[in-house]
């Protein structure tokens, strides 16, 4: 099986260790992985800010970059959601690019979705002794409907004690440009999220979207909270039997 890695902007710039973890995971699964160098931003920031033409340019570049990929895997529910839902919306009325957008969406998977539903992984061999909570991101859980897959994989990590996060469905307040445009509301939302995390007495927060992890993790650091933040890919790569 051949898989192309869609790394995303945040992983490329702020979370390179997540990309490395995805590579380790795919190697463990015996997957042949490549990295199309023509890939760029999925266009979500431009799209959410009303810059439709700029978003279309980014989408077209992505479609071209992954034109020949069999499967496309990304460690981001948010970016996968952009490809799945909004590319088709942008290209309505343009039959050529609409068909290409549909073809791209059909081959694009969020990481945990791919591991569970395509590769059928149910015996993950990694180890991490921690008390943790899992944050469900909005785009991943609501737009893509991916809720159980990451928890199923995390339940297979030896030593990992996953606690139930109160109000787990609540947004962390990031929302891409929302955190900039509505900063005071965003701050209140992330403060509420941190209170809920602390209530579990967990010392590790796990998530599957780096925007959420950047937002919550940044707040935790500014408030000197002793809670580690990791992407689900990093957790799955911990202590792998390589």
Swiss-Prot record:
Top-level taxon of origin: Bacteria
Gene Ontology MF term list: oxidoreductase activity
InterPro entries the record matches: Cys_rich_dom, LutA
One protein family per Pfam: CCG
GO CC term, one of those recorded: cytosol
GO biological process: lactate metabolic process
Residues forming coiled coils: none
Family: Belongs to the LutA/YkgE family.
Purpose: Is involved in L-lactate degradation and allows cells to grow with lactate as the sole carbon source.
Name of this protein: Lactate utilization protein A 2
Gene label: lutA2
């Amino acid at each position: 099986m051949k898989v192309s890695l869609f790394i995303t902007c945040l992983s490329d710039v702020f979370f390179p260790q997540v990309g490395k973890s995805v590579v380790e995971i795919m190697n463990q699964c015996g997957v042949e992985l490549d990295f199309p160098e023509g890939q760029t931003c999925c266009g979500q920031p431009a799209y959410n800010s009303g810059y439709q033409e700029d978003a279309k340019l980014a989408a077209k570049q992505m479609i071209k970059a992954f034109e020949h990929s069999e499967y496309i895997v990304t460690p981001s529910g948010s970016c996968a959601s952009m490809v799945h839902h909004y590319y088709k919306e942008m290209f309505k009325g343009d039959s050529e690019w609409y068909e290409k957008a549909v073809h791209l969406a059909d081959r694009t998977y969020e990481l945990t979705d791919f591991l569970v539903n395509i590769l059928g992984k149910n015996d993950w061999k990694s180890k991490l002794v921690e008390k943790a909570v899992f944050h469900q991101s909005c785009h991943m859980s609501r737009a893509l409907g991916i809720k159980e897959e990451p928890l199923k994989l995390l339940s297979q990590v030896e030593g990992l004690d996953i606690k139930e996060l109160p109000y787990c469905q609540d947004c962390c307040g990031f929302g891409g440009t929302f955190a900039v445009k509505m900063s005071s509301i965003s701050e209140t939302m992330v403060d509420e999220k941190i209170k809920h995390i602390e209530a579990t007495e967990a010392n590790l927060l796990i998530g599957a979207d780096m925007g959420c992890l950047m937002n919550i993790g940044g707040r935790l650091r500014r408030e000197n909270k002793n809670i580690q933040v990791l992407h689900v890919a990093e957790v799955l790569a911990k202590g792998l039997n390589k």
